[in-house]
Amino acid sequence: MNELEFVTKHRRHLHQHPELSLHEFETTAYIKAFLDSLNIKYDCPLETGVIAYLEGNGSHTIAYRADIDALPILEENDVPYRSQSDHVMHACGHDGHTTALMLFVQRCKDMQDAGQLPQNVVFIFQPAEETGGGANRLIKAGAFDKYPIEAVFGIHVNPFADEGIAVIRDEEITASATEYRFFLTGLSSHVADKEQGHSCGEALQHVLTQISQIQQFHLNGLKRNIVHIGHFKAGEAINTVPSNGYLEGTIRTYDIDDLTIVKNQMHKIAESVKLLFNVDCEVKFAEGYPPTINSPKLRTQIEDALIKADLNVYDKPTPFLFGEDFSFYGQQLAPAYFVFIGTRNEDKGFVTGLHTSHLNFDEKVLINVVNFYENLLNNYKEV
């Protein structure tokens, strides 16, 4: 089969069989079977995900990463290859990322067989990008200890940019992503005896108001930050004073100092609830993803490789507010660079955003991704 047939076949198979973070067992088996067919050795440091390696002629070792997990979303696309898993969908394009890396593996194996693979290559089929921090898990598990990796590259499909456009930015390109949760515990009573209870309803209302004011009163208005409330609940019945409350959301920022400010303000909010409402209140933070930092030292190589892949380069003036665990590779492993590849095509109806039930794209864009990867490999220079 030709390369377009290859990416269409594999991407649509993966799209039909999405799996959630840390449960990508069939996806992992599919990748392993593909690598086995090429007689490529690989490791599985975690229960899911695969690390493959090919030795080249040069002394440098570079890595390419694709995330393999999906999202808990019910697909609404009316296509023959729609998800066969109820309420699970590749709504972030990771099926495309995985497919592009598979094709790149095949190209590299062909080059190796011909004695023409210029450098050593590590292929990272990473689990749990959406939740679970798969990149960090792999690093902590020692998955890369035996590889002297000098640079890590990755891409993400981007339905906000047209086909043929690659979006880049030095330094911060995505935000940190930190989840927070407030837990409230009061005392229930009948609504007719409201004074006998300690209401988590009014207390939660106070928390909502105070959180919504953090961005306005405590953060620099010239910086792009998000303090988002995603879900909240108090009580179980309409005629009782609620004895419990719950609120959760996410914080997006590029500045660690701003994140510290938000956390400190949330701790103060929790303390104020105890004083004002006689309700116990605790705030907890889940381990988040740091901002993705693109190494300026890799910029020239990235731009040249994209142009040679017939992609028009757009230098984004401000970072995205997405969270992305590719950030851990640049933070802990080696200089890294993350590129967004445009997939928007209004004529074909490929216009909906990431994490939506109608996300779709033309597989031909994946050929450009692989050309970009190969150009990087063929012209890699140590930084």
From Swiss-Prot:
Top EC group: hydrolase
Family according to the record: Belongs to the peptidase M20 family.
InterPro entries given in the database record: Amidohydrolase, Bact_exopeptidase_dim_dom, Peptidase_M20, Peptidase_M20_dimer
EC number: 3.-.-.-
Domain of life: Bacteria
SUPFAM superfamilies (alphabetical): Bacterial exopeptidase dimerisation domain (SSF55031), Zn-dependent exopeptidases (SSF53187)
The name this protein goes by in its record: Uncharacterized hydrolase SAOUHSC_01399
One GO molecular-function entry: hydrolase activity
Gene3D superfamilies per UniProt: 3.30.70.360, Zn peptidases
Pfam families to which the protein is assigned, alphabetical: M20_dimer, Peptidase_M20
NCBIfam families the record matches: amidohydrolases
Species classification: Bacteria, Bacillati, Bacillota, Bacilli, Bacillales
Assigned keywords, A-Z: Hydrolase
